[in-house]
Amino acid sequence: QGSKVIVMVTDLRESGKPKCERYFPENGEGVEYGSIHVETTQVTSYGGYQQRILAVKLAEEEVYDNDDGTEQNDEQTEEEPEVRYITHLQCKRWPDHGVPKSTSAIFRLYYKMLEYRPRDCEAPILV
């Protein structure tokens, strides 16, 4: 879909219990989901939310040994895979129950979301 922004409006835990599965890697780590490699390259904490930069690319091809001891890739190419950068914004101040007492944190997150999505972009924002 070409999305450039993901907005997460919940925390991973609520009242000490798991609320949402972590679907993004820790800062500096990478995870493979099938043929897709996702790496969190940066995390910045703001007042009521966190911003992560996710680098997304095709996973490296598997290398295996031939019968003669040489290595072979499934796909012989020297090109580096294209990397797409996605901004992940996570609201950290939404209470476990009810609504926030102040709307300032959610509005800051909203304006940051707009900052990372160009006006001429037709790709959806994932929430």
UniProtKB/Swiss-Prot annotation:
Ranges of compositional bias, category Acidic residues: 63-81
Reaction catalysed by this enzyme: O-phospho-L-tyrosyl-[protein] + H2O = L-tyrosyl-[protein] + phosphate
Gene Ontology molecular function: protein tyrosine phosphatase activity
EC number of the protein: 3.1.3.48
SUPFAM superfamilies according to UniProt: (Phosphotyrosine protein) phosphatases II
Signal peptide: none
TM spans (from-to): none
UniProtKB keywords: Hydrolase, Protein phosphatase
Record carries keyword DNA repair: no
InterPro entries in the record: Prot-tyrosine_phosphatase-like, Protein-Tyr_Phosphatase, PTP_cat
Domain Tyrosine-protein phosphatase: 1-127
Residue numbers spanned by region Disordered: 63-82
EC top class, as a word: hydrolase
A UniProt-annotated Pfam family: Y_phosphatase
PANTHER family to which the protein is assigned, alphabetical: RECEPTOR-TYPE TYROSINE-PROTEIN PHOSPHATASE, TYROSINE-PROTEIN PHOSPHATASE NON-RECEPTOR TYPE 7
Family as reported in the entry's similarity comment: Belongs to the protein-tyrosine phosphatase family.
Protein known as: Tyrosine-protein phosphatase 2
Source organism per UniProt: Styela plicata (Wrinkled sea squirt)
This protein's encoding gene: STY-2
